[in-house]
From Swiss-Prot:
Pathway: Amino-acid biosynthesis; L-tryptophan biosynthesis; L-tryptophan from chorismate: step 4/5
Keywords: Amino-acid biosynthesis, Aromatic amino acid biosynthesis, Decarboxylase, Lyase, Tryptophan biosynthesis
Keyword set includes Aminoacyl-tRNA synthetase: no
Catalytic activity: 1-(2-carboxyphenylamino)-1-deoxy-D-ribulose 5-phosphate + H(+) = (1S,2R)-1-C-(indol-3-yl)glycerol 3-phosphate + CO2 + H2O
Species: Prochlorococcus marinus (strain NATL2A)
Similarity comment text for this entry: Belongs to the TrpC family.
Keyword Glycoprotein: no
Residues in coiled coil: none
InterPro entries associated with the record: Aldolase_TIM, Indole-3-glycerol_P_synth, Indole-3-glycerol_P_synth_dom, Indole-3-GlycerolPSynthase_CS, RibuloseP-bd_barrel
Entry protein name: Indole-3-glycerol phosphate synthase
Transmembrane feature ranges: none
EC number: 4.1.1.48
Gene Ontology terms, MF aspect: indole-3-glycerol-phosphate synthase activity; phosphoribosylanthranilate isomerase activity
Length: 295
C-alpha cells in the first residue's frame, strides 16, 4: 500500500488577495496517510520551537542508551514482552481515562516486562515526548519511542527524551529513508525496531540488511483488523533469512492473553508488543504477570 507524503498546495495571488485552489490529491486516502500528513506539520512546528542544535546539546548530557535487543534476548520468559503505554488510538479512541504514564510504567516494570514502548504521537494517540520523559524518570528498563518517524529530527527528539530505541515503519518510508534513518539512529545510540505488515515490506527490509530487530504488525492497514496468521505466514516463509541474519522477531497487535503469546512464539516470534489489552485492564500489574505466566 502506497503512503504518499503531503503534497504542496500552492497559493495564487490576485491583486491583494492570496488563496489556494484545492487539489484533487489534497486529501489523504486512508488513516495512515492522514497521520503521516499531520506528522509533517507537527515536526515543522516542533522545529520552530526547539532547534536541532538544542536537542544535540541536551543529548550530550544524557547517559548511554540501554541495549534494547539484549533486554529481549536475555528474557527469562519467552516470548519476551514489550509493554506499551498508549492512552488512545484511531481505532479505539480513548483506551484509558485514568491515564498516569509514570504509574503504568512502574507497574509494567514491576510486573516483569522486558522493555516499554511509549506512544509519542499527539493528535491520534494523545501521547507526547513529555510522556516519554516522565516514564524515563521512573523506570530502568529500555524504552522504545513509538511514533511515525519521517525525519532525522524526530530521532533526535526521541533520544533527547530518553528513549533507547525508536520505531521505523516500512510502509511510510522508502528504502533510502530506512537506510539513512538507521545511520542517524546508530549515531545516536538508538536501536531501531523496523515494522512490516506484509511480505513485500519484509523483503525490502531484509534486502537492506541493516536491521537486527523486526516487528511484524498483525493489523491490516486498510481495515485495521488484526490476524495473528500474519506473523505465522511471514515468520515461516522467511525463517531461513531471519535465522541467518540473527534477527530478533517481534509480533505486534492482536495479542490479548497467554495463549496468543504461546501461539506467536510457536510461529517464530522472539518477543511480543502488547498495548491495548494491557491498557484496558483495571489491574495492569496483574495483567502483565498473567501474560508472562507469573500469575
Amino acid at each position: 500500500m502506497e503512503i504518499r507524503r503531503r503534497p504542496p498546495n500552492p497559493s495564487i495571488k490576485v491583486a491583494n488577495l492570496e488563496y489556494a485552489i484545492p487539489h484533487p490529491d489534497s486529501k489523504p486516502k486512508n488513516i495512515l496517510e492522514e497521520i503521516v500528513w499531520e506528522k509533517h506539520l507537527e515536526v515543522e512546528i516542533a522545529r520552530k520551537k526547539v532547534s536541532l542544535e538544542d536537542l544535540k546539546k541536551k543529548i550530550k548530557d544524557l547517559p548511554k542508551t540501554k541495549n534494547f535487543i539484549d533486554a529481549l534476548r536475555n528474557s527469562n520468559s519467552k516470548p519476551a514482552l514489550i509493554s506499551e503505554i498508549k492512552k488512545a488510538s484511531p481505532s479505539r479512541g480513548i483506551i484509558r481515562e485514568d491515564f498516569d504514564a509514570k504509574m503504568i510504567g512502574k507497574m509494567y516494570q514491576e510486573g516483569g516486562a522486558n522493555c516499554i514502548s511509549v506512544l509519542t504521537d499527539k493528535k491520534f494517540f494523545q501521547g507526547g515526548f513529555d510522556v516519554l520523559v516522565e516514564v524515563r524518570k521512573e523506570i530502568i528498563i529500555p524504552i522504545l519511542c513509538k511514533d511515525f518517524i519521517l525525519y532525522p529530527y524526530q530521532l533526535y527528539q526521541a533520544r533527547a527524551a530518553g528513549a533507547d530505541a525508536a520505531l521505523l515503519i516500512a510502509a511510510i518510508l522508502t528504502d533510502s529513508d530506512l537506510k539513512y534513518l538507521s545511520k542517524v539512529a546508530e549515531h545516536l545510540g538508538l536501536t531501531i525496531l523496523v515494522e512490516v505488515h506484509d511480505s513485500e515490506e519484509l523483503e525490502r527490509v531484509l534486502n537492506i540488511n541493516v536491521f537486527n530487530l523486526i516487528g511484524i504488525n498483525n493489523r491490516n492497514l486498510k481495515s485495521f483488523k488484526t490476524d495473528l496468521e500474519v506473523t505465522k505466514k511471514l515468520a515461516e516463509n522467511y525463517a531461513n533469512q531471519i535465522k541467518e541474519n540473527s534477527i530478533t522477531l517481534v509480533s505486534e497487535s492482536g495479542l490479548f492473553n497467554r495463549e496468543d503469546l504461546d501461539l506467536v512464539k510457536s510461529y517464530g516470534a522472539d518477543a511480543v508488543l502488547v498495548g491495548e489489552s494491557l491498557m484496558s485492564q483495571e489491574d495492569i500489574l496483574g495483567g502483565v504477570k498473567k501474560l508472562i505466566g507469573n500469575l
